[in-house]
Amino acid sequence: ETIADSFASFLYKNGFTRIFSPKIVLAGAEGGANIFQIKYFDRIAYLAQSPQFYKQYGVGIFGRVYDIGPVFRAEKHNTSRHINEYISLDFEMGFIDSYEDIMKTEIAYLKYMIEQLKERNTFELELLETRLPIIGETIPAIKLSEAHQIYFENTKKDFRNEPDLSPEEEKYLTIWS
């Protein structure tokens, strides 16, 4: 609850407008993603796998938008890092200079969220013996090509021409970082 509440309050205070995207849609929002098909009265519909389409429309109207809600991914996974349904905290900003504007917003939100968790969830944090991270002014980031290269140099397995990280690379880079 605190995470979703802090997300909403932080973005609202920073000029974002909340949108409520539909969860039953006539087509997928992301090309290539597997989506859950359902019968919707006399036609076929799908469970939304992303609010992306609606966020982009919202940016054209409001400039900055966010959405909190369930998303559904009909992708077969065999990892503990993926699930088929989760609550997505999504935001979209228009008229930015670079991806760094988005990263600055994310860092500021993470700091705010951690403050809120410390204030509102002391009991739970102590019960779970959880220590929250300290967020600095920047978060280390590397380019995809650099991630592939680091993995290749250390394992000799070559994914350098792939458009995304493999599950092996994700695991390795988590430990590496």
Model-derived regions, located:
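Context-gated lysine
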Residues: K13, K23, K39, K55, ...
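Class II aminoacyl-tRNA synthetase-like tRNA-binding/catalytic domains
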Residues: E1-I96
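Low-complexity, flexible helical/coil segments
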Residues: Y54-Y57, N84, D101-E106, F123-T130
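Hydrophobic face of alpha-helices
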Residues: A4, A8, M103-L110
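Metal-assisted phosphate- and nucleotidyl-transfer catalytic regions
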Residues: E30-A33, A108-S177
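Extended, domain-scale alpha-helical bundle/helix-rich regions
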Residues: G94-I102, I107, H148-I150
